[in-house]
Amino acid sequence: SLGKTIKKLNVKYTSLNCDVNDYKRIKNNIIKLKKLDILVNNAGTNIPEPFLKVTGSSLETLLNVNTKAVFNVAQLCANQIIKLNKKNGSIINISSIFGLVAGRDRTVYSMTKFGVEGLTRGMALDLAKYNIRVNSVCPNIVLTPRTKKYFANKKYNKYVKESTPLDKVATIS
């Protein structure tokens, strides 16, 4: 896990694993932090659907998790970084390759990740005066316990490998 990797580097970190739609809980956790230098803003979900079949429920879920929650966490953390650390900070929004290019049956997902890209660029401009750097990371499809079932499909696996420059699937460590 990322936590194990960070521990090996002998770096102090706090991991907040919570429902990103629970604004009050997130806010309460963030304002309790005594030190905050870096945010890795990693919230996201995907509901693959053809555009003409997208339901109101899936639209709302994707907007809330992929865009609204990313905004809320970033804003809360930026305010806390400014309050606690007058020198500098860094916010890294985890986006997606689908925030740069569209994907079939990923219209809403792409829309939300394009939103993260716009948010990141706007934040970078607004937070520069506080010496807070803001960037995004746009991975392709990542093999996780949640996505493992898709990789069992040979056609899907081939598609992912062919759409990745290094001809291999990203994994989490």
Where are these regions (language model features)?
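The beta1-alpha1 cofactor-binding region of Rossmann-like NAD(H)/NADP(H)-dependent oxidoreductases
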Residues: 17-27, 56, 172-173
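Substrate-binding pocket helix/loop in short-chain dehydrogenase/reductase
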Residues: 50-51, 58-63, 160
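Active-site loop immediately N-terminal to the catalytic Tyr-X3-Lys motif
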Residues: 52, 101-107, 129, 167
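Active-site helix of classical SDR
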Residues: 74, 112, 120
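Alpha-helical segment proximal to the catalytic Tyr-Lys
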Residues: 79, 125-129
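Residue(s) in the substrate-gating loop at a strand-loop-helix junction
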Residues: 96
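A conserved structural motif in NAD(P)-dependent oxidoreductases
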Residues: 164-173
